[in-house]
């Protein structure tokens, strides 16, 4: 499994991330690194799971290109905008997240608002099987059905 935030946090630790501008720069570098890793692993026949906040209209083409002939499936976790903001505030206030994300910076909050308003967190156009999971109160469908979906679509 490749988690985008783990890659970004490693870059933050190595290169420093004193402000939101640097965080955004490292975010772009992280996606470039993520796509490179995906391409290399998939071309070598390695199966993988990628955890990232891909954006409709931005990530679709890149993912299709790096996937090549690999079989892919998409699981989109979704909740209301209000719940996204509640979870975001809770996470930012917890102090558990890497400080390089600058979660409390006004620019970070504005970016989240723009992202939600732009409806970018909808299914990507990948021509692949899709499962939308409502995470408002647990997982609907539940974990067993999510695993079965992934298993069945990638056989």
What residue spans do the PLM features occupy?
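Conserved substrate/cofactor phosphate-moiety recognition/catalytic segment
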Residues: 1-44
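Conserved phosphate-donor/acceptor-positioning beta-strand/loop module used by diverse small-molecule
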Residues: 68-90, 133
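Small-molecule kinase domains that catalyze NTP-dependent phosphoryl transfer to phosphate-bearing small molecules
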Residues: 93-144
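Conserved catalytic network of the ASCE P-loop NTPase/AAA+ motor domain
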Residues: 39-43, 66-70, 123-125
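Conserved nucleotide-binding/hydrolysis micro-motifs of P-loop NTPases
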Residues: 6-8, 79-85, 137-139
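Loop/turn-to-beta-strand initiation segments
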Residues: 44-48, 73
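Short, electropositive alpha-helical surface patch
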Residues: 55-70
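C-terminal accessory "lid"/substrate-recognition subdomains
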Residues: 144-155
């Amino acid at each position: 499994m490749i988690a985008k935030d783990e890659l970004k946090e490693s870059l933050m630790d190595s290169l420093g991330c004193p402000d939101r501008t640097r965080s955004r720069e490292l975010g772009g570098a992280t996606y470039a690194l993520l796509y490179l890793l995906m391409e290399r692993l998939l071309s070598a026949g390695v199966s993988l799971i990628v955890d990232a906040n891909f954006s409709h209209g931005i990530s679709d083409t890149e993912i299709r290109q790096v996937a090549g002939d690999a079989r892919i499936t998409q699981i989109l976790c979704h909740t209301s905008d209000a719940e996204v903001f509640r979870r975001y505030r809770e996470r930012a206030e917890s102090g558990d997240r890497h400080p390089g994300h600058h979660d409390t910076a006004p620019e970070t909050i504005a970016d989240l608002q723009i992202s939600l308003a732009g409806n970018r967190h909808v299914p990507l156009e990948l021509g692949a099987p899709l499962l939308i999971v409502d995470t408002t109160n647990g997982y609907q469908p539940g974990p067993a059905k999510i695993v079965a979906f992934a298993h069945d679509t990638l056989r």
